[in-house]
From Swiss-Prot:
Functions in the N-end rule pathway of protein degradation where it conjugates Leu, Phe and, less efficiently, Met from aminoacyl-tRNAs to the N-termini of proteins containing an N-terminal arginine or lysine. Its EC number is 2.3.2.6. This is Leucyl/phenylalanyl-tRNA--protein transferase. GO terms for molecular function: leucyl-tRNA--protein transferase activity. Pfam families: Leu_Phe_trans. GO terms for biological process: protein catabolic process. It comes from the Bacteria. It is an enzyme of class 2 (transferase).
Amino acid sequence: MLTWLSRTDFDFPPLDKALQEPNGLLAAGGDLNPQRLVAAYRHGCFPWYQDGQPILWWSPDPRTVLFPDELHVSRSLAKCLRQQRFEVTFNRDFRAVIQACAAPRNYADGTWITTPMQLAYQELHLRGIAHSVEVWQERQLVGGLYGLAMGRLFFGESMFSRADNASKVGFVTLVRHLRDAGFVLIDCQMPTRHLHSLGARAISRGEFADYLQRYRDQPPTGDLDF
C-alpha cells in the first residue's frame, strides 16, 4: 500500500516498502519544503512527478550510481577535453542551469522539473546544499547539470546539452573534482545509455542504503571548492 505524506510528516516509510510496480514508488504527497527534501535524500528517495500529479517519492531497485574511480572517458571524449573547447564552472548560474534542464526536449512530453521544483532546489542552492556545473562556449551556456552534495555523496538530478559533448565534459569535470575531494559515490538514480557510457552501473537498493548510512555524514577528505 502506498504511503501518503502530510505536510507536517517528514518521516518516509522504509525503503523496502517501495512498490515493485511502478518500480520504486515509495510515497506520495507532502511538499517540497527544504527540510523534507534533505530528509528524502538522506533516506534514499527523491521527488519525481509531472504537473497535475501529487508529489511522488521514488527509491528504485536497482539504483544507478557511478563510483568516481570507475569513470570511463572514451577516446573521443578525452580528445574533446584536451582540446579545451569548453569552459567549466561551478555554481556560477544555478538558476540558468535548472531552467535549461527543465526546458522541453524533443524526445519527451512535458517536464518533471516543475516551477515548484525549480524554486525548491534554488532554495537548497542558497543553503549550500545544491550545486550546479556550467559548461560555456564563447560565453554562452551550452551544457550543465545540478545535484546535491551530502557528506561524501553527490546526488545528480538532471543535465542538459546544447552542443556536442557539452554535458559529458561537465559531468567528467565534476566527477574528477568530487573524486579529488574524497567522494565515494554519485547517485544517478535511473539508468540511461548516456550515463552507462561514462561508467555508471546498477547496485541494489540495499547496497545503496548501506552507502547512505556510512557516508552521508562524513565530511569530504579533500578540498570541495564549489
